[in-house]
Amino acid sequence: MGDDLDAWAEACDRLAALGRRLGDDDFPGNEADRADGVAHVVEQTLCWLGWSVFHADPRRPSFQRQNDLITQWGGPNADNVYRHARVEPGRRYRVRGRMHSCQEFILAIRAGFMHLPTWGTLVEITASELGIAEGDEFDFVVGEGGQVPLPDGALTVSIREYYFDWSEAEPALFTIECLDDDAGEPPARRTAAATAAQLREGIDGVAHSAEYWNTYMREKAAEGVANTFAPAFALDKGLDAARYSFCFWDLDPDDALVVEVPVPPARYWTFQLYELAWFELVDVADRLSSLNHTQAPVGGDDVIRLVLSHTDPGVANWLDASGRRTGLLTYRAFWTTGEVPTPTTRIVPVAEVAAAMPTGTALLDAAGRAAQMTARRRHLAWRFRT
């Protein structure tokens, strides 16, 4: 066989081995979690083989959307669209488009993805810093002489689009093109060696993702105390704008976790739910698995209060554990101007949540909850319409 066919056979063998690996003791053992894991490997295969095989040429970049409703990895933000284009230092790229309903973006020049041996944020700049606002058209250059530098070691131009209010409206449009003279030349036909290298890079991405994030979640859970938030941290080599606080929950069916925290000195904050091992969002379209600063009513004392439970307690700020006894509740604060307070927690019976909350706590009945979920699904249909 040729090298490309050998690489294909290797990839298939490694996928089969990864499927068997999901049955090992350090991965979740119950049937539902294992089924989620098999689906997760399918997602990773789609994501990383697609990236390596079809987004391989920095002369012909295009944005690959990741961490949407399908290709999730590494704890995606429910308020984001993620896009990545492969680039090469020394080249120049033009990024154009229109914000439409996108309210902010972070453009990061990255050395690679977090689960790979080489990764990290090299450059970070926001739409606001580029003078771009909701509804605006934009046109800027990445590379020498442009608005965004492209340093040595760069692999991707990565975009995180922010949708704070989840409206039913057109999402952002991004295009990218290489401006170098040789970018106008048609690429050569595929070679066996190039395809083999792309397949091997892609299957490495699949395997690294599944292994890395399972280990990451296990280690983070072991560092903390169940149902308690750890102090907020900045991720080394991550975004300067971001602070994260983790709470790994462990709740009986009739338990409710009441969370309280003063409003942080931040432009944006959000609470979101994740599956263990796979680090995917708990079903963002059909479960109330995220609340941000525009969606969660805040008390008159400037304290955020929310409830995590398996059944709806009737308060507006509810997060749906969706029958998962364990999982990760992440608190994000972005663009901070001071210390981010650590949320406090207490467990109460879900039937007693109303009595445990202050007078004036915002409530939501079944009809209101149904309307809330319908609005979320309609927004997501717009955001991920293609």
Give, region by region, the residue ranges found by the protein language model:
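A compositional/structural signature for long, glycine/proline-rich flexible linkers
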Residues: 1-386
